Amino acid sequence: MSDIADKVKKIVVEHLGVDESKVTPDASFIDDLGADSLDTVELVMAFEEAFSVEIPEDAAEKIATVKDAIDYIEKQKAA
Amino acid sequence: MSGTATNGRRVVVTGIGVVSPLAVGAELTWKRLIEGQSGIGRITHFDPSDLPAQVAGQVPDGPTAEGGLTLSDWVPVKDQKKMDRFIHLGLAAAIQAVEDSGWKPEDEDDRCATGVMIGSGIGGLQTIYDGSLTVSSGKARRLSPFFIPSALINLISGHLSIRYGFKGPNHAVVTACATGVHAIGDASRLIQYGDADVMIAGGAEAAICSLGIAGFCSARALSTASNDDPTKASRPWDKDRDGFIMGEGAGVVVLEELEHAKRRGAKIYGEIGGYGMSGDAHHITAPAEGHEGAFRAMKAALRNSGGLTTADIDYVNAHGTSTMADDLELDAVERFFGEDAKRLVMSSTKSAIGHLLGAAGAVEAIFCLQAIRDGIVPPTLNLDNPARESVIDRVAHVAQQRKIDVALSNSFGFGGTNASIILKRFKD
C-alpha cells in the first residue's frame, strides 16, 4: 500500500471513528462507514489539509469510497 | 381540582440530572453541596493570567464513578468534535435525567408525546471563538461543516431527541441567566396544554473560556478580589462580595404529566407548584431599585399555584449571585413574604458552585427538590458578615435540617428577565 493510501486510511479512521479493518478500498463513506453528508465534507477538508491539495466541490462529490479518495489524491500529486 | 391549574393536568418531576463544579451526578453534587464543599478554583481551561478574574467553577475531569467528567461515557468519541462543550455537558445531564426517570417510549404515540426543551444562556462561545480565528487567518474554506451545529443553542435538544427518538416538541430557551427556570416552567406548560406528556427540560452552560471571562470582566460583573483564595470568592449577601463567579455545567429534569407517571409507577421527586415571569423594562444588566421585577415574578408564580400563599413556602433558593444585586433581591423577598419572612429560610447555592448562567435555574430547581426530599437546606458559604441584616435566615456556612414542603427558586437574567418557579412535595 502506498504512503498516500496509508495516510488516507488513517484520516478516515480518525474522523469517522471506525475500526481500521473496515476501511477497505471499496468501502463507501456513507453506506459502509456510517458517515453523513457533513462528515464527508469534513473528510475532504482533512484530505486537503493533510496532502496540501485543492479538491473542488464537483470533484469532492465524486469521492464516495476510500479508493476514490486515494486515486484522486495520487493523480493530483503525480501531476 | 388540586395542584396546578391549567386543564387540570398536573406536572411532576420523575428524573433529575446534574453536571456541576462539585460533581457529575445529581446525588454526588447534592451530597458535596450539603457537606459545605466548594467547587470554585483557579481557572485551568485556559491561562487567565491576563484577566482580572481568574477563578471559576469548572466541572472536574475524572472517572464517572467518582463524580468526574469522562466525556466518552456520555458522547461517542467520533461525535464529540461536532459539539461545543455546552452540548457535552447538557447531554451528560439529560442522559442522567432520562435514565433516572426510567421513561422509554415504546411506540410512535409515546415518542410523539415526549419532547425536549433544554436551553443555554450563551451557547457555543469557544466554538465561535475558534471558528473566527480560522476565518480571520484566511482559512474560511477550512471552517468545519460542524461549526454551526456545534454552536447553536437548540442542538442539545436536537441531539437528545435523535439519541432517544423523542419526537414531541423540540425547543430551546435563551434568556441569559433565567434560561433554566424558563425552560422548566415553559415545558411544564406544554404538558399542561397537552402538547406533550413528558418533557425533558433544563439548561446548560460552558462559557469559561477567554472570551466569556473577558466579556463578563468588561461588564464589571465578576469577582476579582479572591484570585488567591478561590473558595472564598463567591459570597452572596456578604459585605465583602465583589462580583459573581462563573460556573459551568447543566441541570435537566424529566417533567411528566401526573397520571402518565402514575400509570408506569414512576418515582416522583415533587410537583411543579407554580411558575411566574416578568420583565424589568429598566436596564440591560442592572435590576431596578427594590427589584420590583423579582417581586412580580414571585407574585406571578404564586398566582397560578392553585391556592398556595407565602405562608406555605418554606425555602427560597435565591438568585443571589454575590453581586450588589443580592440585597435588591433580598428587599423584594422581604416585601413579598411580609410577616411570613420571619419563618422563611433562604440560601444561595451559587456560593458553592458559582453562577452557571443558563444552567443555574435548572440546577437550583433540582436542589429544591432534593431539599424537599431529604429535609435539608443547603448552606450559603462565606456569608461571614451580612451587608445588611434581615429577618430571613440565610443559612450561613452550614446546611440545616428542616422540613421543606414547598420551595421557590428565583432566576434573573441580563436584559431584565425574571423567572420564579415553585416546587412542592407531591401529595396525591
Curated annotation (Swiss-Prot), chain A:
Keywords: Cytoplasm, Fatty acid biosynthesis, Fatty acid metabolism, Lipid biosynthesis, Lipid metabolism, Phosphopantetheine, Phosphoprotein
Function: Carrier of the growing fatty acid chain in fatty acid biosynthesis.
Family designation: Belongs to the acyl carrier protein (ACP) family.
One Pfam family named in its UniProt record: PP-binding
GO molecular function: acyl binding; acyl carrier activity
Protein name (database record): Acyl carrier protein
InterPro entries hit by this protein: ACP, ACP-like_sf, PP-bd_ACP, Ppantetheine_attach_site
Subcellular location, principal: cytoplasm
Residues bearing PTM O-(pantetheine 4'-phosphoryl)serine: 37
Organism listed in the record: Gluconobacter oxydans (strain 621H) (Gluconobacter suboxydans)
